[in-house]
């Protein structure tokens, strides 16, 4: 077969024609270049700060923007946002979404699409603004990817999990038939603006929810980040990762930056997930099924933490983690008041959870297990017997005497 290359308007894209036994044929080869920015920008709604206005600018014409905002975020920041936009001559319309896990369905995506259509969002130069947690940015991202076959959007994550995970990658998604993120696309926002000041109004549980995903990054690739969580975890929650006199400002900013950097280092070379062996899938082998089975009792990060605890015990049983290392891992989880077990975590559910993950990973477990703290290996041979033994170990260690001796009678969130 001889191929003849034709001209192309796009670098890296080619059209070839060739002949087969039955006649003419063509092959299309195209590359999609993607670049986007993730910017830490404190005091985002300060009228003197032009960053948001610049992101929404239309050049010489007055900006007109659709803003999809979480209902809670609107109650907290709606007036401040409106004053900022008015001060920068941005005409806007709010689409308010009560963005919780139960609303993470296609019906909510269609609500956003309806708002986009009614507003008259053009195809290229008027990005929709998504302002809220990871659930909201996932919903808006999916709507933007579908509307006119892809329109741009800008993310302002207001939760920690949005700032270090859901709001900085390429994936969008909603749940379908009790399956986590079963429907989705790859459609990164052109810009993500991270203002740690929003965390000041985040409740402690949702802050811990984000710290669970930071712990994920720490355990598989960043031992220094783990040390920071171990040393400052409680105060990070107490002070909502805010700077201040006697506060954890320096540690908080370092934790945030290392978490974002670590996540992006893993995502960038494999943005479209052509490679299904992903370090950032640590904590995500069992957790999608656990989270959906326990809904609405568990937040995403809490389900991930249960998965990480189970995976860490599996690693310990295989000699990848020492007893001391496993103790440190579980102690940090308890320090952050994150769960390590839940009543839905039966052997049958975990068997089904792993089976579904194997389908998602194209027939392989590709399960990341920690090897020491700050490193990981992939395994493909975890057995049901190992899972049941790990569940038993977790149940036995649920409230270890050493923790009570160190910290007294405290609610450990398990």
UniProtKB/Swiss-Prot annotation:
Cofactor(s) listed: NAD(+); Zn(2+)
UniProt note: phenotype after gene disruption: Deletion abolishes validamycin production.
Q: Does the keyword Lyase feature in the UniProt annotation?
A: yes
Which residues make up the binding site for NAD(+)? 70, 101-104, 134-138, 158-159, 171, 180, 198-201
The EC designation for this entry is 4.2.3.152
Q: Which CDD domains match?
A: EEVS
Q: Which residues bind Zn(2+) per the record?
A: 213, 284, 300
Q: Which residues form the active site?
A: 171
Enzyme category, top tier: lyase
Record-level Gene Ontology MF annotations: 3-dehydroquinate synthase activity; metal ion binding; nucleotide binding
Gene Ontology biological-process entries: antibiotic biosynthetic process
Q: Which domain of life is it from?
A: Bacteria
Function, in words: Catalyzes the cyclization of D-sedoheptulose 7-phosphate to 2-epi-5-epi-valiolone. Involved in validamycin biosynthesis.
Q: What is this protein called?
A: 2-epi-5-epi-valiolone synthase
| Protein species of origin | Streptomyces hygroscopicus subsp. jinggangensis (strain 5008)
């Amino acid at each position: 077969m001889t191929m003849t290359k034709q001209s192309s308007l796009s670098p890296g894209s080619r059209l070839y024609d060739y002949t087969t036994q039955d006649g003419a044929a063509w092959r299309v080869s195209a590359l999609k270049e993607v670049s986007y920015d993730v910017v830490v920008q404190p005091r985002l709604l300060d009228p003197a700060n032009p960053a948001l206005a610049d992101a929404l600018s239309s050049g010489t014409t007055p900006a007109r923007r659709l803003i999809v905002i979480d209902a809670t975020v609107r109650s907290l920041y709606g007036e401040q946002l409106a004053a900022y936009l008015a001060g920068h001559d941005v005409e806007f319309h709010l689409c308010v979404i009560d963005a919780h896990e139960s609303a993470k369905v296609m019906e909510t995506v269609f609500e956003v699409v309806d708002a986009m259509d009614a507003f008259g969002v053009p195809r290229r130069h008027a990005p929709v603004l998504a302002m809220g947690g990871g659930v909201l940015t996932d919903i808006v991202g999916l709507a933007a990817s579908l509307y006119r076959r892809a329109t741009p959007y800008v993310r302002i994550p207001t939760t920690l999990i949005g700032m270090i995970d859901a709001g900085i990658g390429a994936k969008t998604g909603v749940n379908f038939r009790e399956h986590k993120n079963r429907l989705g696309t790859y459609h990164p926002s052109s810009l993500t603006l991270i203002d740690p000041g929003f965390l000041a109004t985040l409740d402690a549980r949702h802050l811990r929810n984000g710290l669970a995903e930071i712990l994920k990054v720490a355990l598989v690739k960043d031992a220094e980040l783990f040390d920071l969580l171990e040393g400052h975890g409680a105060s990070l929650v107490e002070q909502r990762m805010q700077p201040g006199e006697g506060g954890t400002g320096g540690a908080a900013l370092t934790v945030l930056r290392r978490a974002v950097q670590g996540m992006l280092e893993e995502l960038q070379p494999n943005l479209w997930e052509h490679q299904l062996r992903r370090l950032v899938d640590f904590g995500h082998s069992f957790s999608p099924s656990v989270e959906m089975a326990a809904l609405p009792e568990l937040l995403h990060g809490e389900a991930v933490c249960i998965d990480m605890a189970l995976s860490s015990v599996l690693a310990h049983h295989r000699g990848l983690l020492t007893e001391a290392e496993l103790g440190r891992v579980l102690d940090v989880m308890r320090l952050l008041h994150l769960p390590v077990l839940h009543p839905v975590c039966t052997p049958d559910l975990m068997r089904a959870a792993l089976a579904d993950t194997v389908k998602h990973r194209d027939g392989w477990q590709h399960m990341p297990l920690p090897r020491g703290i700050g490193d990981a290996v992939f395994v493909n041979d975890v057995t049901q017997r190992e899972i049941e033994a790990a569940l038993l170990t977790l149940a036995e260690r649920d409230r270890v005497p050493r923790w009570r001796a160190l910290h007294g009678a405290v609610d450990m969130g398990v």
